Amino acid sequence: MTLDVFTKVVSQADSRG
């Protein structure tokens, strides 16, 4: 699992707030 994938998931969660 690369950081790129992790960042993508975090980005989605952050967008939801």
UniProtKB/Swiss-Prot annotation:
Contains two covalently linked bilin chromophores. Its main location: membrane. Keywords: Antenna complex, Bile pigment, Chromophore, Electron transport, Membrane, Photosynthesis, Phycobilisome, Thylakoid, Transport. The keyword Electron transport applies. GO terms for biological process: photosynthesis. GO terms for cellular component: phycobilisome; plasma membrane-derived thylakoid membrane. It is a peripheral membrane protein. It is found in: Cellular thylakoid membrane. Heterodimer of an alpha and a beta subunit, which further assembles into trimers and the trimers into hexamers. Belongs to the phycobiliprotein family. Light-harvesting photosynthetic bile pigment-protein from the phycobiliprotein complex (phycobilisome, PBS). Phycocyanin is the major phycobiliprotein in the PBS rod. This is C-phycocyanin beta subunit.
